[in-house]
Amino acid sequence: MGLTYSSVIDADRDEVFSWHTRPGAITRLIPPWQPVRVLREAGSLRDGRATLTLPGGLRWVAAHQPDAYDPPNAFADELTSLPLPWRHTHQFSPSGHAATLVTDVIETPLPARVLRSTVVYRHRQLAADLTALARARAISQDRLTVAVTGSSGLIGTALTALLTTSGHRVVPLVRRLPRAGERYWRPEDPAAELLDGVDAVIHLAGASIGGRFTAERKHEIRTSRIQPTRRLAELAAATQGLRAFVTASAIGIYGPDRGDEVLTEASPRGDGFLADVVAGWEDATTPATAAGIRTVQVRTGIVQSPRGGMLRLLTPLFETGLGGRLGDGKQWLAWIALDDLLDIYRRAVLDEALSGPVNAVAPEPVRNADYTRTLAAVLRRPAVLPVPGFGPRLLLGDEGAREIAQASQYVLPERLTGAGHRFRQPELTGALRHLFGREGT
């Protein structure tokens, strides 16, 4: 019982071990298909405790063992909160030139087949993160202080962990009572000292575009983005030492349906509610640009993660055999894996050559029919029940269905490609296999 698994990571042992000691490491290694959340990270790999939340109100408390702490060779943790024997030893040894043999030894009554997909995911994720980090450091080795709005959302949580494991300091800007290390942010009237000591801002906050496009909903979508962004950009302009102002944006700026037209950052904006909102959203960054701050608008495609967005909605349908293409399935889907989006945000902060709008999409868009076939194949389920066109209209209304569910946008990441940016998951099959722990299948 239990499992021992090894792989070689293309980074030296000190760097691999050090990565595990940084805040956010445990968040980066939790498989996205598992209903697990980090409640508290361990303050130390020698004797700290990490607490994870599980379904049903259960908690997984991993207590690190002082007797096994041997940097940079090993550390171990044991489960203390549940009646399940569990000891997880993490071992690191040199392997050739500037590489590390990483070995996980899990001692538990659970069979290896239950553990394998999780452990394989952790190794692949660790390798990918360290490879991407090496590329980021080739751009800039600076360690920055980055203020982040929307840090508790799907993207913000993952991005915070990526930045902190990269050696940066993250200052969450929050609208509730701030905890240690956070700052209170009033979107309509931010405090003059909010950005003091900050090198860069990543502004993610904004109301979800999901749901029916009622007048009230459209007002919330617009007002949660444009005015708060302008106020934050004005504050950035008045703050000494700020190097970069990076804001979320969306490919909705190109309009809901441009046929087979290839859309790049140089393409004209489209028509429709979302195009109007995104244009105003991007224009709201003007005060920062006018002050000489490098400003980047990350025009985000359809983010792929089982933890949120479209994929979270589709997964249960496909797992029960009820998934299928939407209408005729000819709509273009400009998708992006979550980790690739995070890498783009990190690059936007670090790369002095990057400014203005940047399409954050994978280099290979797919049609809706191809997307649904691929998802079904990865989940090993059929995709034989097409969703009629009126289905999204029932849920989202005519305008919402046209602008979201039925949108067709052939968007390419021309500026990133021109900059030599490397994607972790450039094609859909590999991305979905990684996200669902189906690599090698």
Say what each PLM segment does:
Residues 143-144, 351-399, 433, 439-440:
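Mid/C-terminal beta-alpha module of Rossmann-like enzyme folds, strongest
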Residues 289, 297, 301-332:
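NAD(P)-dependent short-chain dehydrogenase/reductase
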Residues 144-166:
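N-terminal Rossmann NAD(P)H-binding glycine-rich loop of SDR-like oxidoreductase domains
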Residues 315-324, 330-365:
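Alpha-helical substrate-binding/gating segment
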Residues 230-272:
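Conserved Rossmann-fold NAD(P)-dependent oxidoreductase catalytic core, especially the SDR/UDP-sugar
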Residues 183-228:
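NAD(P)H-binding glycine-rich loop region in Rossmannoid oxidoreductase-like domains
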Residues 27, 32-35, 41-109:
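Hydrophobic-ligand binding "helix-grip"
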